[in-house]
């Protein structure tokens, strides 16, 4: 991506352009965010925008990668091994704190997830794929460490349990995100309710819901 000229400018100016750009794309789609609006808000000329990024698409994708990096930073958590749910929620709490700390970046990702422009569709899909992969890898590490408190049956594959719990948690999260897809930040106003839902669903999975003789 054409950004070497942008990397040469001062950190203060760079951060100002990044913040203004993210705010614009958190409010407008790729097509709706006209170049004239971008340069006006960022306080730079159209010539400088093209000098730094070559075109609007490169600027958009640079900002999207930047936002993803911010929202996936420092997600490693210390595992206590004493309480399964405390361990699982520790990484979710970190994600929640990052989302609260970077609301415009969160709104930008939400806008990007609904982007319909063919010009950036493939690149957005690739970036989001890497975002989910990175998040899931960190969640799986946390799950793997957390289930060490359980006395698993000898015939149970540890990795299979990790995969199953990861898929289950992901499905619960997606369910709740869909409820708040128009205003994703509202989810975190109901964060305790969200965690209680995860606790109930995971408890159902871990404890089972069939009588022991039902499968005989």
Where would I find each of the regions flagged by the language model?
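Amphipathic alpha-helical packing segments from all-alpha helical-bundle domains
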Residues: 72-82, 86, 120-151, 159-163, ...
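C-terminal peripheral helix-coil segments that are non-catalytic and often amphipathic
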Residues: 97, 137, 141-145, 167-216
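Amphipathic alpha-helical segments used for helix-helix packing
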Residues: 100-125, 175-184
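Gram-positive cell-envelope targeting signals
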Residues: 4, 9, 30, 36, ...
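Alpha-helical structural segments
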Residues: 12, 16-23, 27, 41, ...
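Amphipathic alpha-helical segments that line or abut small-molecule/effector binding pockets
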Residues: 85-110, 159, 163-167, 195, ...
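N-terminal intrinsically disordered/low-complexity leader segments
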Residues: 1-12, 213-216
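Helix-turn-helix
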Residues: 2, 16, 27-58, 62
């Amino acid at each position: 991506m054409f950004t070497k000229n942008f990397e040469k400018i001062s950190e203060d100016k760079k951060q100002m352009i990044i913040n203004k750009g993210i705010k614009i794309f958190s409010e407008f789609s790729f097509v709706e965010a006209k170049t004239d609006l971008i340069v006006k808000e960022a306080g730079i000329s159209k010539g400088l925008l093209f000098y730094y990024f070559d075109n609007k698409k490169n600027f958009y994708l640079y900002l999207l990668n930047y936002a993803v990096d911010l929202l996936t930073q420092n997600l490693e958590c210390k595992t206590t091994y004493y309480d399964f749910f405390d361990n699982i929620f520790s990484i979710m709490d970190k994600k929640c704190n990052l989302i609260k700390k970077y609301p415009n970046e969160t709104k930008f990702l939400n806008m990007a997830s609904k982007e319909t422009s063919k010009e950036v569709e493939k690149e957005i899909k690739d970036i989001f794929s890497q975002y989910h992969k990175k998040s899931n890898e960190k969640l799986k590490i946390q799950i793997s460490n957390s289930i060490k408190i359980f006395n698993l049956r000898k015939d149970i594959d540890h990795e299979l349990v990790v995969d199953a719990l990861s898929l289950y948690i992901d499905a619960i999260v997606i369910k709740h995100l869909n409820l708040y897809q128009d205003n994703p930040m509202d989810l975190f106003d109901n964060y305790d309710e969200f965690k209680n839902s995860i606790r109930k669903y995971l408890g159902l999975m871990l404890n089972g819901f069939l009588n022991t003789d039902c499968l005989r």
